[in-house]
Amino acid sequence: MKKKNIKYTILKTSYALFQQYGYHNVSVLQICQACQISKPTFYKHLKSKENILNYYFKSIDTYIPDEWYRYTDVTNYWNHITKGFLYLIDHIQLVGIDLYTENFIVNLKNETQTLIEVRAFHDTICDLIEAGQQAGQILNPASSEELYQIAMRLLSGYGAYWCMIQGRNDLKDEFIQGLSASFFVNEEAHHD
């Protein structure tokens, strides 16, 4: 098996085991047995079991369709911004509460961000925010960068709350309401 294929196999197998048995109920040894590799081979490709989560969240941009980045015909910038964030939330919900909670714990220990920043997503959201401000859909005068950072922190916060209450809230609706309030979205933009 090629080096890249081994790492891919470890990651794919790990996620399947985590989904089936829960993150804490799966050991590195079980991952190795399922992949038919030795522990030294595992550690040659990954630093730790926790490191597996980083790879899963680094791939978050693969869940955003290429078409979303092409928005030349868009007139409701607010709506397009929410679509982008809803793709991220879909990924979070697909991961599930168990793995997303573990991701929070790992990132708190390592003092890193929960969601890996994807440059293309960042740039597109900032462009859409500026266009939305110019169109009068977003009334908050803060810079697009500031509003982007607010949005990402809101997403982390609502994601953490979703984990704490075991998914008994509507993560999508609550996030969009919070984002709308933060951006001071013009009421008409909600109905286009």
Which residue ranges define each predicted feature?
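Alpha-helical DNA-contacting segments of helix-turn-helix folds
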Residues: 52-60
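A secondary-structure capping/hinge motif
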Residues: 48-52, 100
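Short hydrophobic/aromatic patch on the recognition helix
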Residues: 35-46
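Short secondary-structure transition hinges
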Residues: 89-126
